[in-house]
Amino acid sequence: LAKNDGFGTIEKLSDDPLTVKYTIAEGVQWSDETPLDAADMLLQWAAESGVFNEGEVTYDEESGAIIPGADVYFDAAALGTGISNVTQVPEIGDDGRSVTFVYDSPYVDWELAFTSPYVPAHVVAMHALNIDDATEAKDAVLAAIQDGDTAALKPMADFWNSGFDYADLPDDPSLYLASGPYVISDLSSSEAYITLTANENYVGDLDPKVETITVRYNEDPLAQVQALQNGELDIINPQATADVITALEGVDGVTVATGVEGTYEHVDLVYNNGGPFDPATYGGDEDTARLVRQAFLLTIPRQEVIDKIIAPLNPDAEVRNSQTRVPGSPGYDDIVESNGSDFYAEVDIAKAQELLAEAGVETPVDVTMLYGKSNIRRASEYQLYAESASDAGFNLIDGGDDEWGSLLGSGTYDTSLFGWQSTGLGVSESAATFRSDGGNNLTGYANDEIDG
């Protein structure tokens, strides 16, 4: 864990109850020179803890964006993680630069539970409550949270959810403030790039070494190679395929670095969209839905994906049988022995057909798969999955979309194919994915035992 004391510090004050103090370093500010302080941290706690969330939340089926309701609801990805374990309003100290969390129960990842504020509290309140002065806006945030004023929290939550959702550089510079070494200076959805410029008002220890950085996005790795060859880019990080490696070998003056990383391809099934894996489709019959899910998993040709797509790049690659541990890491073998992954270890078309027959569903069963359409590897995987699924009685519908990321969790597909990165240091980082209230739970999976 690399600490950044130039931004702030974390101090554990007590084990029982677990009490942790988070302090912002003196002088740290947003790029508009407004101090970054307890108001920003308290707003982030309010959003990520879910303490003030009420009612049910609904999302737009096409965009996946949250639809504002009548109640307070912060749509934070961190819901269900460690901050949810802090239910009392944190105490402010150090002249407004610190907040102290008292956890309801012990939490092993307390050093990782709270990140630096990424949304300026004064901007949220200025827009949501029509306040012109930054200091007055911060005071309004503090008062609303400390008093539990839902009338003020409701518009702030709505703006927190959607006010910073843009694809091109906004006319209002308050919407792209930064507290780090760089600030956004240009953003284009049509040309798929973002430009970062050194933040002239940055206060901290991580002074920028390059004045301007432009990052371009392209789902097609071969197009990235072409842009590098044309001199349009200085560095690329394409998803590796045999074709990409071959293409890079033909580019003069380029250094190619390859290696193994913690990303793994995975297929998720959606439990709550009225589709083939949702019990609601069968009148609430969970057993039928489970049989259909099991049948589908038995068609996933994981080893064939390794052999045909991954092995040409990494002959030592192997299937991964745990969502929480990488092969070779401590505890991996023990987890695999008991997590049920042996059920779908091998493709078994005959067994899949038996399960569908037992479920009593009409075949072929339509299943829509979401993936990055221009991503060569994912498109190749989809073809392998579709061929195998059809043998068992599934019709795997091509739901490839280059905007796949924004569609995750929208319920507009039945299964998804993308990559997770195992880069976090947290012991409990999977909670956000597998708890029913987890902000990263994109499938609708719910299990009382997991929720605790």
State what each model feature region is.
Residues L1, G6, W110-H122, D268, ...:
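A structural "hinge/loop" feature
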Residues L1-D15, L177:
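N-terminal lobe/hinge region of extracytoplasmic solute-binding protein
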Residues T9-L13, V89-I92, I184-L187:
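Short, exposed beta-strand/loop patches in secreted or surface proteins that constitute
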Residues D16-E56, P173-Y176, G180-I309, G328-G452:
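Extracytoplasmic/periplasmic ligand-capture domains
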Residues K21-T23, E61-F159:
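Surface-exposed binding/hinge segments that line
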Residues Q29-S31, P106-W110, D316:
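Primarily extracytoplasmic ectodomains and periplasmic/lumenal surface modules that are beta-strand-rich
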Residues T58, P312-S322:
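Short, glycine/acidic-rich hinge or "gate" loops at secondary-structure transitions
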